[in-house]
Amino acid sequence: MELATRYQIPKEVADIFNAPSDDEEFVGFRDDVPMETLSSEESCDSFDSLESGKQQDVRFHSKYFTEELRRIFIEDTDSETEDFAGFTQSDLNGKTNPEVMVVESDLSDDGKASLVSEEEEDEEEDKATPRRSRSRRSSIGLRVAFQFPTKKLANKPDKNSSSEQLFSSARLQNEKKTILERKKDCRQVIQREDSTSESEDDSRDESQESSDALLKRTMNIKENKAMLAQLLAELNSMPDFFPVRTPTSASRKKTVRRAFSEGQITRRMNPTRSARPPEKFALENFTVSAAKFAEEFYSFRRRKTIGGKCREYRRRHRISSFRPVEDITEEDLENVAITVRDKIYDKVLGNTCHQCRQKTIDTKTVCRNQGCCGVRGQFCGPCLRNRYGEDVRSALLDPDWVCPPCRGICNCSYCRKRDGRCATGILIHLAKFYGYDNVKEYLESLQKELVEDN
């Protein structure tokens, strides 16, 4: 409910408004025209017309103009240096002013908050200004509050203009804020409803698709079963084209093989291989002495006739491999390897053993036969002892020592393959098991047994 009351301004208040100010003269308000609609230029023109006409009946249009406000304008301050201490608690609560209470009740909470914030801003500005300006403002009274702005400040609103402008602007701001908040709430509600509806639609579509897929699957299964039944019926109706075999073998059960036999478990033997020795393993085809065999063998190698003429055998590395007994030193004898661990392998500086074909730097035997050459007469300590039962040191110090290949008793893989026999492999452990010291004696015993059996 708006208050539309008009009060006739007394002469004292009119004198206050008609008194000249610092910058320009204030001649009063124009009758029946609100101050909000007047600009700075129009207000000046209206004041000139009022001054020329000397209108005494000046009316102040404000619904908030009360007796207390009129008394404040009439009373004069005691001194120019006195400051305004503010309103009392009763004035703020509105107990003595029922009209102000009505206006405050019309305002909403947002309007009251805006008014309080504006009052705080005014207090901060007053604190920021120096004391002289404040004393001057208090000495003039409230006449400065109703001064019209100049042409430069025409667009800027005056904070101390009137209470009507203050309340109207506060109401407009509050209405705008409430409208914006309502719009935002409506948009949020609409968005939530749209999202929920979309999610519900998606879930419905997914459930419908899944149900459709299940229905199609069941229909396909039924159709396939019906088709298979029809095909089987057609096949059964035509036995001439597709004869049905009687399951004779299905009735017979296969005999289950047992993993272990009930009798005594026999030792598992390795399968026969081509590398294993034949039946006549160590049997020699001749029964001559070793010396005669060696003589015949070397004479055969030296006799390579071409047109009835003999050709001498070319000797290779004869000078480098032959060492007389006088050249053997104590260092050479100490360098002889007794076991396999004493052998040091060296592919650059080492020399090769005829039996094991390993290139080591230990001292090896030297064959004193004039027809022996190269690696043929070189045997290391372990090979000469295990395979033939001889010692390398005694062989080096013997000027008449001849290597096993020259004697025709070599049992290495190359020599046995050349003679048409298979390789023996590692037989030293088997020979020691049967009570022999070397492989040569074990092979000779086998040969004697075979000869005796024949």
UniProtKB/Swiss-Prot annotation:
PTMs per UniProt: Phosphorylation increases its interaction with PSIP1.
Keyword Protease included in the entry's annotation: no
Motif Integrase domain-binding motif 1 (IBM1), residue numbers: 9-33
Location in the cell: Cytoplasm; Nucleus
Record keywords: Cytoplasm, Isopeptide bond, Nucleus, Phosphoprotein, Repressor, Transcription, Transcription regulation, Ubl conjugation
Tissue specificity as recorded in UniProt: Ubiquitous. Overexpressed in medulloblastoma.
Modified residues (Phosphoserine): 21, 79, 105, 108, 117, 138-139, 162, 195, 197, 261
InterPro entries associated with the record: CDCA7/CDA7L (IPR040221), Znf-4CXXC_R1 (IPR018866)
Superkingdom as given in the UniProt entry: Eukaryota
Pfam families xrefs: zf-4CXXC_R1
Covalent cross-link Glycyl lysine isopeptide (Lys-Gly) (interchain with G-Cter in SUMO2) as placed by the record, residue numbers: 222, 225
Chief place of localization: cytoplasm
Region ranges (MYC-binding): 213-235
Expression induction or repression: By MYC overexpression in a concentration dependent manner in neuroblastoma cell line.
Motif (Integrase domain-binding motif 2 (IBM2)): 65-91
Effect of residue 17 to A: Significant loss of interaction with PSIP1. Complete loss of interaction with PSIP1
GO CC terms, sorted: cytosol; fibrillar center; nucleolus; nucleoplasm; nucleus
Quaternary structure annotation from Swiss-Prot or TrEMBL: Interacts with MYC. Interacts (via IBM motifs) with PSIP1 (via IBD domain); phosphorylation increases its affinity for PSIP1.
Function: Plays a role in transcriptional regulation as a repressor that inhibits monoamine oxidase A (MAOA) activity and gene expression by binding to the promoter. Plays an important oncogenic role in mediating the full transforming effect of MYC in medulloblastoma cells. Involved in apoptotic signaling pathways; May act downstream of P38-kinase and BCL-2, but upstream of CASP3/caspase-3 as well as CCND1/cyclin D1 and E2F1.
Name of the protein in question: Cell division cycle-associated 7-like protein
Species of origin: Homo sapiens
The encoding gene: CDCA7L
